Amino acid sequence: MADSIAANFIRQSLIYPQEKLYVQTDKAAYISGEDIWFRAHLTDALSHIPDTTSRYVYAELLNPADSLLKRVKIKPANGVYQGYMPTDEDIPAGEYQLRCYTKYMQNMGEDYFFRRKVTIGDPLSALYRTHTDFEYTEDKKKVNIKIYFTEIESGKTILPENIMISESDGDLKKHKIKEDSCIYLSRKAPADKKSRVLYISYDYQKKFHKQYIPIPYPHNEFDVAFMPEGGNLPAGIHSRIGFKAINANGTAEDITGIVVNEKGDTLTYFESKHLGMGSLTTFSLPGQKFFAICRNKNNVEKRFPLPASTANTVSLQAYWLRNQLNIALAKSEDITSLNSDYYLVVHCRGNVLYSEKWNNSKDFITFRKEELPTGVIQAVLADAQMNPVSERLVFNINENDLTKVSYSTARQQYKKRENIENRVSVTDNAGNPLKGDFSISVTNSNDILPDSTVNILSSILLASDLKGNIESPASYFRGDLTNAHPGLDLLMMTQGWRRYNIGRILKGDPESPAIMPETSQTISGIVKGGLLMTKPAAEYPVNILATNFPFVASGVTNKDGRFAMTGFETPDSVRFIIQGNNKKGGSRVELLLDIDTFPQIRRSAPLSLSGIDGFEKYMQKADEKFMIDNGMRMIYLKEVEIVAKPKIKVGKLPYSSPMNRLFTSEDIEKTHAHDMYSLLGRMGGIWVSGTRITMRNAEPLILVDNMEMNNTELHMILPEHVDEIEIFSSSSAFFYFGQRATNGAIVITTKKGNMGIPGKEPFNIKTITPLGYQPLREFYSPKYETAEQRNDATPDLRTTIYWNPTIKTADDGTATFSFYSADTSAAYSVVIEGMTSDGKVIYTTGKIEVK
């Protein structure tokens, strides 16, 4: 039986290997218009060996309402996935997220994607501050909002003009400041994340500012989940119960509490020890009821029932004793001896470490720390039919799995604009050199500190193997890694393992992936022939031509009329002409292309972020650098002559309104969208899944050049043929278009006025611009090799001093590189993250002094 269990795990890993993804960025916060530089580390989920089986990694920038703004596609160059995410100059200030994944990861769902929070500000965020006070009514059905504005330097109240604020349905409404210099709103308590974000824009002293502000949950809302160790609570014995308290925002809530019985007698006291987590010990008999009375820091008290104990129950218990892990089988007091067989399976990431029938003569089984690998270890107790009956997670750190990474510079201190020589050494625990590669970020600590809430250690070894959101995972990996953080065991008691379905593996019923790894670009579709062009046409020729890239291909359809061109890849913005013909070369066929689909965006758990203290000073400096590199910003309306202010746009249609949202051809060009579906999906408030388009969960009216169009027909229009798009809310759409527009309207005006289809494209020809890979671009780091360069009067105001995602160690485990310091005296923060070729994590931090 033990051999078959191990064989089942091996079979599962071969049929369905999984991936892990971690993404490092050059810094934690940006100013509008800056590029977000990143490196993606893609590994095999079991071995952690770097893996490029998936040819592409997708990176998306999501706004605070979880709507897509940009998407880029990265391919490996010399085994390295590196790229950048451009941000628009006029992007609203707020808390954004990077969402990164491969197509193959969609098999496991969005929980397996990597997300990272980034803060984006605009220059006016350094000058003016928007203050918001939120107060919920007693029944929590409404929230009253007070808004006012101040100048940061003086603290004085300011009175902006043309203030636009988003309504609950996403529409913008103009507001005026009251006599007390405030704006007052009252609205229904937000039901979802999209309506839990305020969008505010205004003018002040001929400057234009816009930002997102989250609407918090009520302060007195919190919940506590209680989880018995091993998942069961055997009656008549002392058992541990782990608990986790979170507030309505989804983040940790520190609590204290007591356990009481049905009579109200106090039995024990407990308190959270780390990020809302803790444990308590109980003793109960069948039928007894116990309750936890919990109190948070706001003195809000709540009562929760504790899990009930049951007779004839077994459960796993685990505890560390020095460097020894003991796994015990706890039995309810009515079980004097086990009458049925149980099997204990212990594995780490699917690699079976132990699988044996439980020996009834033993109270516990012991594992030495050095025998276990580093990472999340799952112990599973299964019955004779291989049904899991109890589970316990533990976390182990094995010194032999860790790398020793040393970072040093040639000198302890450097001057401005001086060459800084760096050396990195990577060895195993015994001092043997290791080959690998890593990315390095060097930032000015006076401007911004590195994000300390997540790193490659915490992601690869911990968070990627656990269910649910792990708040501030890097907090478990500070200091001496050989001594586990005391909060780790609490985390193991309150989270679940999230990779394979263990029950199916134990029974020899492995899962299989529905989506295979993406190995190349693909253009696919179907050709239909016959009298009415409705029947799948077998063995019909299909030809593909790239108009702005050297690529041609041809093939024939299969018996179902389908075709798929693979084995090629092109950079972004390449246009293809695809033509289908009948066997005689005639054009009387209809060609239908498959539309590239991307995973939906669902509400995410709140992500932690640190290092953005003093962000306002940083933005002033970053803005000055931006203008040195790019010229005057468009938001500075006072210094440049602009006839039409960007704050209120009115379309060209006779029924256009400034209350609608308008996207001009210039706006559309900035999105770099490849088809109408991806274009509309990047417009806030519009949801696109395949060809289905919804606004507030209902399908809107779609008009193209004043003609109603089905959403499935939008593939005929290219974004570059669109002159403007105007989004009507349900109320304004109903006024102009009647009953058919009760769900709102999307009004598209093309440049040629013929539905954007030049000369009416034939049925057998389609033109598309699919998402291609992002061409490589190198981070610019200036050199000061000559006296002329060193004396250049142009200030060097870099906030990211150096970014290099492609550093590899030599055979001796070392790597050297250099860069020049900037013009500011400061301590530089260094972050190094990567993987060795045999699957060990490379991570260290350092400092550089510049005087």
How should these model regions be labeled?
Residues 691-731, 755-764:
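Periplasmic plug
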Residues 81-87:
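Ligand-binding face of N-terminal immunoglobulin V-set domains in extracellular IgSF glycoproteins
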Residues 12-16, 27, 31, 52, ...:
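Surface-exposed, low-complexity/disordered segments
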Residues 168-169, 262, 703-706:
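Short strand-turn-strand beta-turns centered on an Asx-Gly dipeptide
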Residues 62, 342-355, 385-388, 392:
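Extended, solvent-exposed regions of the mature portions of secreted/cell-surface glycoproteins
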Residues 2-19, 24, 29-31, 35-75, ...:
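Contiguous segments within soluble domain cores/interaction surfaces
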Residues 58-62, 164-166, 256-260, 343-345, ...:
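Beta-strand signatures of extracellular beta-sandwich domains
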Residues 73-76, 174-180, 268-274, 552-560, ...:
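Short, acidic Ser/Thr/Gly-rich low-complexity loop/linker segments typical of extracellular
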